[in-house]
């Protein structure tokens, strides 16, 4: 049997025991991938960071351990990184 964790509506996107952890990093837009990874892992050490070109089609399942980094052609963060 499998279970699905759905993203709740509203500002708090966390559904687990990590309610005090940061869930988005707007300050990282324009930074390098390495800078972004370093900051995110300081805030959320268990994060699985996935780097993708901006515009990539992704699955819709919500995972509290995943942060996607959408990068431009210069490998700079193009969208706000978020848990999910």
Swiss-Prot record:
Residues 1-12 form the signal peptide. One of its GO terms (cellular component) is extracellular region. It holds the Pfam family potato_inhibit. Belongs to the protease inhibitor I13 (potato type I serine protease inhibitor) family. It comes from the Eukaryota. SUPFAM superfamilies: CI-2 family of serine protease inhibitors. Coiled coil: none annotated. Optimum temperature is 25 degrees Celsius when incubation is carried out at pH 7.0-9.0. GO terms for biological process: response to wounding. This is Subtilisin-chymotrypsin inhibitor WSCI. It is found in: Secreted. Inhibits B.lichenoformis subtilisin, B.subtilis subtilisin, bovine pancreatic alpha-chymotrypsin and porcine alpha-chymotrypsin with Ki of 3.92 nM, 5.70 nM, 7.24 nM and 9.35 nM respectively. B.lichenoformis subtilisin is inhibited with a molar ratio of 1:0.87. Also inhibits chymotrypsin-like activities from the digestive tracts of the insect larvae T.molitor, P.interpunctella and H.armigera. Does not inhibit bovine pancreatic trypsin, porcine pancreatic elastase, or human leukocyte elastase. Monomer. Transmembrane segments: none annotated. Residues 1-28 are annotated as: Disordered. It comes from Triticum aestivum. The record marks 60-61 as: Reactive bond. The keyword S-adenosyl-L-methionine does not apply. Its main location: secreted. The keyword Secreted applies. Keywords: Protease inhibitor, Secreted, Serine protease inhibitor, Signal. PROSITE patterns: POTATO_INHIBITOR.
